[in-house]
Amino acid sequence: MKVAIVGVSGAVGQEFLRVLDERNFPMDELVLFGSKRSAGTTYTFRGKQIEVKLLQHNDDFKGVDIAFTSAGAGTSKEFEKTITKYGAVMIDNSSAFRMDADVPLVVPEVNAADALERPRGVIANPNCTTIQMVVALKAIEQLSHIKTVHVSTYQAASGAGAAAMDELYEQYRQVLANEPVTVEKFAYQLAFNLIPQIDVFTENGYTKEEMKMYNETRKIMHSDVKVSATCVRVPALRAHSESIWVETERPISVEEACEAFAKGEGLVLQDNPAEKEYPMPLFLAGKDPVYVGRIRKDLTNENGLTFWIVGDQIKKGAALNAVQIAEYLIKVKNV
């Protein structure tokens, strides 16, 4: 098994290295690709030094079985055919192909089998906020069809990249030192603040991030579910949180929901209000599962249920999900 990582120097690329090692992913060879800026850099993987190759239109992907790509939508679109022309399965972390009809959009806990139908040799990784939400929604959907979802996200600074996380650190330092605050990666100062905008606004008043949650959820779950999202950047460092309200076709009790979440693949139930036990990003950065808590019946709709989830957006929201897709393909001997 020969594996490639495209965009290895970024936050998700680095997480790919960690996840592949942690999970003892089966491979005989790992090749790394990057831009002119990162080409020539070396990374250690399983005791070996691997030099980053310059990504270019040549035959470097000949013999590659699986290519994990996380170098941005533009790069993915430009290099799709170069990466796949010799048969490599391209598992792409960007937004480039997610809504293409001939590209499966996969969260293994929800729709793993979709990965088997990939006419272009490409499988898309969903947006981080969508991934953790649909893992939780799957548990409820198995009890009763979900008709409507209202979700508010609380997205950590690192979701905007490593430089954004560094800027948040610096902003806190500047505020506490009574210095002018540097604002480059966000629309406004994030330290001691919330910003109710992630990505650009569309004509309907929702941001692109919010519309991703609508469109991607319906594609992944093969569902007519209606999703209304509000995405907010918060001054946490890592791990995204979401407050989710669902309306199901029949009433779901808290006990039923808790049992479903406890048994749900990729989920950890952390719901003990009496002991103040509930998921928080401070304690869940770097963890694999999606954590669920604050489960309660809606007071205005007998078919409504409300809960709170937290997941690491770089791990399950990106690298881990992609690696799990590859593991599934290996398991069913489809790569």
Where do the protein language model's features map onto the residues?
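N-terminal Rossmann-like NAD(P) cofactor-binding subdomain of oxidoreductases
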Residues: 1-190, 226, 290-291, 295-300, ...
